[in-house]
Amino acid sequence: MRSVELDDGLVEWRGALGFDRSDDGLAPRRLPDWTRSRIPDLFVESMVRMSSGVRLAFTTDSDTIELDAQLTAFRFEGQPPMHHGVDVVLDGAVVAQEQTEGAQRFILDPITRGVTGFEPAEPWRLRWTGLGTATKRVEVWLPTNATTEIRSVRIDDAATIAATRSGSPSWVHYGSSISHCMEVVHPTETWPALVARSSGLELTSVALAGQCHLDQFVARTIRDLAPDFISVKVGINVINLDSMRERVFTPALHGFVDTIRERCPDTPFVLISPIFCPVAEDHPGPTAPKPDGKVRVFERSEVLAFGSLTLRRVRTIISEFVAQRRANGDANLHYVDGLTLFDAPDWESGDLPDDLHPNPVGYARMAERFAPQFTAIR
């Protein structure tokens, strides 16, 4: 087997906008390098470094492919480790799905998110053989819920490898953990990946768990990418952290869209409101986990709650926001109600186990429901 250079253009890093480099390997980042100084804390940084939606793409006639990766993840005290998955796609078809618990892992306090411990782990070695010697388009989808430092990619000694340049339309999606999909083990099964693969789109995911707060450095990133299609699913994190009240939310949303529209004035752009969350429908945040893993909200006086946002109010604001801007001439701005993707009956069916995040079945249902709406808009 011979090693393939990771940064000489033969391997395309789709969905990666920057890299962390070490003597051992290359780890993709999902925001460009210039944003490093804008990132406010280590938890945001860890979400940027997670490889949700990132895949290695190349063309090869190698019968065998090997990959070594060092995974870095976290878990909260008292919780079991997550499983991490890698999927292999040949000529558009998923042919292999691997998973492991073997990541080096930081242990975090569930309230403060401070680091309380560390669990070491060896690199993960993966090998796929019997792939055939015909030339094929390969995509290796990396884990949704870990930083993935690629140490080595190897192919057969006599095999050839070349870059695979996609001619598919580009789609950038920004959202919260419900778009990041850390609960999904297999990376081709996040709802954005399912939509992208079924719709023939090249996905770049800047969905950052817990961190969808309309940050301008994300808006500038999307603007500068100038994709063919844009979607933003916003609202739940604003309530989770109680980071904005109504006075701030609407202007922040205008500013976010205005920044993107500077370079993408006519790009089809979808704003998606939050899916169902029982505790926050009519009660403002912040939210926090209970000992049983479900989320809760907190009672407070009317004075302190004045102007706070609930999910029901956020949906109304976003719907009215889109209607206003369309009336002012932005005909390519569209609204999708998050309740059309996941509503109370889906929660009642058990597919929102912590009352906040769908399980893989719930995410698949979201993809099935969003894809036709997205197609109609495009």
Where are these regions (language model features)?
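N-terminal secretory targeting modules
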Residues: 1-170, 291, 375-378
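A short, flexible beta-alpha/helix-coil linker loop
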Residues: 178-180, 236-241, 350
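A general structural detector for well-ordered alpha-helical segments in enzyme core domains, enriched
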Residues: 191, 249-256, 314-321
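Oxyanion-hole/transition-state-stabilizing segment in secreted/luminal serine hydrolases
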Residues: 195, 214-262, 274-281, 298
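A short helix->loop->beta-strand "cap" motif at the edges of active sites that frequently abuts
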Residues: 264-269
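Catalytic His-Asp segment of secreted/periplasmic serine-dependent ester chemistry enzymes
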Residues: 277-378
